Amino acid sequence: MADTTGRIPLWLISTVTGTLVIGLMGIFFYGSYSGLGSSL
């Protein structure tokens, strides 16, 4: 794992990005559904 220093694996980037996107979409949809999204 020493050769990956300073370089992030592509699968890790895609996994983290996908998780963040799904999480943010879920939060926004839940917020708008429960009426709290208007404050954002």
From Swiss-Prot:
GO terms for biological process: photosynthesis. It is a single-pass membrane protein. Pfam families: PsbJ. GO terms for cellular component: chloroplast thylakoid membrane; photosystem II reaction center. It is found in: Plastid, Chloroplast thylakoid membrane. Its main location: plastid. The chain crosses the membrane at residues 8-28. SUPFAM superfamilies: Photosystem II reaction center protein J, PsbJ. One of the components of the core complex of photosystem II (PSII). PSII is a light-driven water:plastoquinone oxidoreductase that uses light energy to abstract electrons from H(2)O, generating O(2) and a proton gradient subsequently used for ATP formation. It consists of a core antenna complex that captures photons, and an electron transfer chain that converts photonic excitation into a charge separation. HAMAP family: PSII_PsbJ (MF_01305). This is Photosystem II reaction center protein J.
